[in-house]
Amino acid sequence: MTAEMNKIPEAILSLEHASNDRWNRGDYHGFLESYTKDVTYFDPLTERLLVGRQAVEEHFEKFYKGVDVARSEYLNEHVILSEGRDLAVLSYNLRNYVVDEKHAEKRSAAWNSSEVYRLLDGRWRILHSHWSLTRHPAIVAKRAV
């Protein structure tokens, strides 16, 4: 990979981290600003594919307003770049930590994330976003029995 191509994954990771930092402070607009107008979106709370920034914003407002995450850990970050260098797929695992009532940090949700970015008018934008739980509680509970 050339030095120029190395800058693209760094730029995408920087955008993703900045959006997630805002999310952790209860501001989901960082992600909304990164989405294209016709973004497609899934997460564990969606019953169907959400299409369009407006639909995603309504979903965020309903389920994620006021999120408060103390910190996040990014694991297994991987960016695949198209030959044309205008399309990239970012995949990673995210561990979130919150502060409990005793002011102790504890692990919260663990996520799988896949984001499809496209370079549009000189700016990397998210075309598709898919979030899932890393280890779904129902599946983990069945295995523990």
Task: Indicate where each model-derived feature is located.
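A beta-strand edge to alpha-helix "cap/lid" segment located at domain peripheries
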Residues: 2-33, 40-145
